[in-house]
């Protein structure tokens, strides 16, 4: 191994920079091109700012969908609207009058 000039910065040492520039190709050869390519392409690690995804515009039929939701009636409480006492009495009457149950 040849001696390196001590006055030279480490990133300027011979062989520290690849002879070809980095590119956007993701083939095996380009993924192992240099340490930066290996981290970003091979491992998928990037410490830069994340690109903000653009929100897609609403589909063309969405306006009618929103209108139909607002026209729906409000939810009603579950169970018999007459009340719990009346529903129990109604069940008792039905069981008394139904001869097939016995």
UniProtKB/Swiss-Prot annotation:
Binding positions for Zn(2+) 1 per the UniProt entry: 22, 33-34, 37
Domain of life: Viruses
Ranges where the record places region Cysteine-rich: 22-37
Annotated spans, Interaction with the host capping enzyme RNGTT: 49-86
Other information: HIV-1 lineages are divided in three main groups, M (for Major), O (for Outlier), and N (for New, or Non-M, Non-O). The vast majority of strains found worldwide belong to the group M. Group O seems to be endemic to and largely confined to Cameroon and neighboring countries in West Central Africa, where these viruses represent a small minority of HIV-1 strains. The group N is represented by a limited number of isolates from Cameroonian persons. The group M is further subdivided in 9 clades or subtypes (A to D, F to H, J and K).
Assembly, per entry: Interacts with host CCNT1. Associates with the P-TEFb complex composed at least of Tat, P-TEFb (CDK9 and CCNT1), TAR RNA, RNA Pol II. Recruits the HATs CREBBP, TAF1/TFIID, EP300, PCAF and GCN5L2. Interacts with host KAT5/Tip60; this interaction targets the latter to degradation. Interacts with the host deacetylase SIRT1. Interacts with host capping enzyme RNGTT; this interaction stimulates RNGTT. Binds to host KDR, and to the host integrins ITGAV/ITGB3 and ITGA5/ITGB1. Interacts with host KPNB1/importin beta-1 without previous binding to KPNA1/importin alpha-1. Interacts with EIF2AK2.
Name under which the protein is recorded: Protein Tat
Gene this protein is translated from: tat
């Amino acid at each position: 191994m040849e001696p390196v000039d001590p006055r030279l910065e480490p990133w300027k040492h011979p062989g520290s920079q690849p002879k070809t520039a980095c590119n956007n190709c993701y083939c095996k050869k380009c993924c192992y091109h240099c340490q930066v390519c290996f981290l970003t392409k091979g491992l998928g690690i990037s410490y830069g700012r994340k690109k903000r995804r653009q929100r897609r515009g609403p589909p063309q039929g969405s306006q009618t969908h929103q209108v139909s939701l607002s026209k729906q009636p409000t939810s009603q409480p579950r169970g018999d609207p007459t009340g719990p006492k009346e529903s129990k009495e109604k069940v008792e009457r039905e069981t008394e009058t139904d001869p097939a149950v016995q």
